Amino acid sequence: MKKDVKKVVLAYSGGLDTSIILKWLQDEYKCEVVTFTADIGQGEELEPARKKALALGVKPENIFIEDLREEFVRDYVFPMFRANAIYEGEYLLGTSIARPLIAKRQSEIARLVGADGVSHGATGKGNDQVRFELGYYALGDNLTIIAPWREWDLNSREKLLAYAEKNGIDITKKPGKSPYSMDANLLHISYEGLVLEDPSHAPEDDMWRWTVSPKDAPDKSEIIEIGYEKGDPVSIDGKKMSPAEILTELNRLGAKHGIGRLDIVENRSVGMKSRGCYETPGGTIMLKAHRAIESITLDRGAAHLKDEIMPKYAELVYNGYWWSPERNMLQALIDKSQEHVNGSVKVELYKGNVTILGRSSKDDNLFSEAYCTFEEDSVYDQKDAEGFIKLNALRFIIARKNGRKFD
């Protein structure tokens, strides 16, 4: 039985699926629909979404199109990269990190317009339904959540197209539109479906939209210097930029040199395995450079603790727990560790590779040439190492005296 909902805020892309959802909400719930379209760097013109919403009967005052690129990078991407977060050893969480912001703004708009419901276009098989809805529960005011893919009987492409045609929804395929299921933002672009559903099948070369093939990348490498303040990149080659500008420029450079392609099978939060291909050129550069500046500015214990908690942090982001107390606790610890992560990193970009050429920090460098030199020095007495080793071996010595063997 459907709940009585008067006004619903829909996460609306302007594409076929969410346009069908918009009409379906009007027909099935007899409710007023408010559309929210976020610009998080997907690289598409968003004004057509306004025209489509108007054509489907949405009031002009109920159409929200907002540029969230700076907020997305500053408050979501950068905090995640301070953690060096990678899911299952490879995935840089480009889709996962975008959902909390959309859910947050949807909940805020619902409060603003007095809506009592929210809706999204995520399917009942994927991770995004979890990410969106955990956000609604964390931030919304007793909102009714409508997930059409879990309710309707439009469970095939043919049925969706028939519904669209019946209701006058434009189903014209855009020129050059990919046949894959794609999701893009300023951090990455993802591809799923079709031949990718066979994990043994290599993706077609023309699938990749952002990056050139590494073998077709320039034969001459490019060297850049990234400046860091408190763990965040703030400049490229000495030029200060905003967070979104930094990521945009690193994307351009990385894509030019064939950097950031990834083909993986991941474990979804709902239990199944999924094959996905990703392009994350700027993020790949940022991760390598951030670890490099940390290598000279972080204390050993702090660095190792960060590495220990990173998989848990990444799992929380992947599974939709961005707003959870535990993620916020970990973030506070991570942000504390970044107070002295200041300096710059020289990076070489060449045919799909990111190579660190150097790292420096004027005020926070813990690398001491005086201590680590292989030449004669006056600050380190090598005899001190003998006692250190004996203390660390004490448990072995005691165990052997008690007859225990280690071979």
UniProtKB/Swiss-Prot annotation:
- Tell me if Ligase is a UniProt keyword of this record: yes
UniProt: L-aspartate binding residues: 123, 127-128
Q: Which UniProt keywords apply?
A: Amino-acid biosynthesis, Arginine biosynthesis, ATP-binding, Cytoplasm, Ligase, Nucleotide-binding
Q: Provide the catalytic activity annotation.
A: L-citrulline + L-aspartate + ATP = 2-(N(omega)-L-arginino)succinate + AMP + diphosphate + H(+)
Q: Which cysteines are joined by disulfide bonds?
A: none
Q: According to its UniProt record, where is this protein mainly located?
A: cytoplasm
Going by the entry's taxonomy, the superkingdom of the source organism is recorded as Bacteria
Q: Which amino acid positions bind ATP, per UniProt?
A: 11-19, 38, 121
Respond yes or no to whether keyword ATP-binding is given for this record.
yes
Known EC number: 6.3.4.5
Per the record, the gene is argG
Q: Which CDD domains match?
A: ASS
Subcellular location(s): the record lists:
Cytoplasm
The species this protein was found in: Campylobacter concisus (strain 13826)
Task: Report residues binding L-citrulline.
Answer: 91, 96, 127, 131, 181, 190, 266, 278
Q: Which family does it belong to?
A: Belongs to the argininosuccinate synthase family. Type 1 subfamily.
Name by which UniProt lists this protein = Argininosuccinate synthase
> What's any GO biological process attached to this entry?
argininosuccinate metabolic process
Record pathway:
Amino-acid biosynthesis; L-arginine biosynthesis; L-arginine from L-ornithine and carbamoyl phosphate: step 2/3
Q: Specify one Pfam family.
A: Arginosuc_synth
Q: How does it assemble?
A: Homotetramer.
Q: Tell me, what is one Gene Ontology molecular-function annotation carried by this entry?
A: argininosuccinate synthase activity
Concerning InterPro entries, the annotation shows: Arginosuc_syn_C, Arginosuc_syn_N, Arginosuc_synth, Arginosuc_synth_CS, Arginosuc_synth_type_1_subfam, AS_cat/multimer_dom_body, Rossmann-like_a/b/a_fold
GO CC annotations on file: cytoplasm
